[in-house]
Amino acid sequence: MSDSPQNPGPSSLKIYFRLLGYVKPYIGMFLLSIVGFLIFASTQPMLAGILKYFVDGLSNPDAALFPNVQWPWLRDLHLVYAVPLLIILIAAWQGLGSFLGNFFLAKVSLGLVHDLRVALFNKLLVLPNRYFDTHSSGHLISRITFNVTMVTGAATDAIKVVIREGLTVVFLFLYLLWMNWKLTLVMLAILPVIAVMVTTASRKFRKQSKKIQVAMGDVTHVASETIQGYRVVRSFGGEAYEEKRFLDASQSNTDKQLRMTKTGAVYTPMLQLVIYVAMAILMFLVLWLRGDASAGDLVAYITAAGLLPKPIRQLSEVSSTVQRGVAGAESIFEQLDEAAEEDQGTVEKERVSGRLEVRNLSFRYPGTDKQVLDDISFIAEPGQMIALVGRSGSGKSTLANLVPRFYQHNDGKILLDGVEVEDYRLRNLRRHIALVTQQVTLFNDSVANNIAYGDLAGAPREEIERAAKAANAKEFIDNLPQGFDTEVGENGVLLSGGQRQRLAIARALLKDAPLLILDEATSALDTESERHIQAALDEVMKGRTTLVIAHRLSTIEKADLILVMDQGQIVERGSHAELLAQNGHYARLHAMGLDEQAPAPVG
């Protein structure tokens, strides 16, 4: 799968700059936050400087703060009053900077994460089917949740630390250079060592972050599968197996998290040691080369130098946060850069008659050599029903998926009303097609909203009720606690299988599309549900061109044309009676299980 971390991909810097490109809509707030952090950082050397006046004031508290200025009120300001007042003013100035920086950067960062999350979800809506075939739902969900959270760290904490602590280091270095540039140059000698350590650690952090990202996707995937299939898990006694599967996935994630923590736990103390060695050398030189500096000057210089390790350490630690964010952003951008479904058609029709022609159609799935469909040809005139019959894996579902362009076929043509399906605008093409599949998809919403879904949203309640009645669903809907406004639960969990299928048929009836693609359910239902569903299917197929993957004999007998498929080819075609008379593939399939009696009609 493409979730694998092996691909080195683009550089961290390139990815991070692309991530920061999402800041453009918030540039005003971003600049305000930088102003705030500038204010905050400027207070650090001020605090060191105020100690100079405090120490000097110990021996002469009545000394003037600014003895050489011309304004009397400032010239007469004594240290005993000035130092406490300045500390309060510096604290207020620092508080203002902290508020501006933190608040506005949080707005920028949360907006950025929101934009990324929405962009990811919107991209999922237009990605081709093959993308979902090669990416597990767990990993896709993990990108929207966990990976975006990693980006949040890079876009909030990391930027805040880089700007605030970076500016603090700059201001403190400028202050130290101003006080004694020779001594300060000694400290600069450690910068190459720090740079090498940060670069080495960054590579490790990014590599480990990618592995964590994949491991977290595995955790989400296992949990998602187990939750969705909890009935199968319980009925087949799969609890122990799923426990072990989740335990292994979670343990793998924990181990990778610990390895990353270990890297940080080793790296940070080593960096601190380097910084404090430089500080020790600096203090030795200060004491040895004291010169004519006052005690206040020395205290201020040592204090400013002592304030440096904390922001430098925080800057070094931010590397792991940034690399986690870069790893998350890389997978996010991989999805955002994926090409959407091909939609280069220009034809739009208000309504089609429903004439479907498949001409010399061949298809194989991307990345495989096996021909799934081979030279398929047939014509369905408006209102006709074509039944596809064959063993599992014969290509029936693939053929049905090619008509609404869920996949792009390799050779041949599919024409709707004489126009190739590729020439239609994708949205317009699918507007003419109603789809009823075996696996009914319902959303955690009301019954009415599940029937009037998507383009059908906003349909009058009378039309929704009419569609439900035609699908033999209105009776059970009226018996629900809140009727059409009853919530059906996730994927219709509060409804029976037969009820879910009737809602799907009602949805197709409300759409009133000229072309119906129907994959009959193979699941065994009670006789009452079977009768209701068969009656609903008869209603939904009236007057529509229908391509049905048929499992019921009653459906097959009504077909205008039966296509018998085997290994991607049409091996027989004709009516039910004609095919039985041939005593070939269809006759054998009929003998194996297509001979059940049609349910009795409703009413």
Curated annotation (Swiss-Prot):
Keyword terms: ATP-binding, Cell inner membrane, Cell membrane, Lipid transport, Membrane, Nucleotide-binding, Translocase, Transmembrane, Transmembrane helix, Transport
Catalytic activity: ATP + H2O + lipid A-core oligosaccharideSide 1 = ADP + phosphate + lipid A-core oligosaccharideSide 2
Gene Ontology MF annotations: ABC-type transporter activity; ATP binding; ATP hydrolysis activity; ATP transmembrane transporter activity; ATPase-coupled lipid transmembrane transporter activity; ATPase-coupled transmembrane transporter activity
EC supergroup of this enzyme: translocase
Domain ABC transmembrane type-1: 31-324
Residues that, per the record, bind ATP: G390, R391, S392, G393, S394, G395, K396, S397
Record localization: Cell inner membrane
Parts of the chain that traverse the membrane: 20-40, 79-99, 170-190, 269-289
Family: Belongs to the ABC transporter superfamily. Lipid exporter (TC 3.A.1.106) family.
Entry note about domains: In MsbA the ATP-binding domain (NBD) and the transmembrane domain (TMD) are fused.
Protein name: ATP-dependent lipid A-core flippase
Organism listed in the record: Pseudomonas aeruginosa (strain ATCC 15692 / DSM 22644 / CIP 104116 / JCM 14847 / LMG 12228 / 1C / PRS 101 / PAO1)
Organismal lineage: Bacteria, Pseudomonadati, Pseudomonadota, Gammaproteobacteria, Pseudomonadales
This protein's encoding gene: msbA
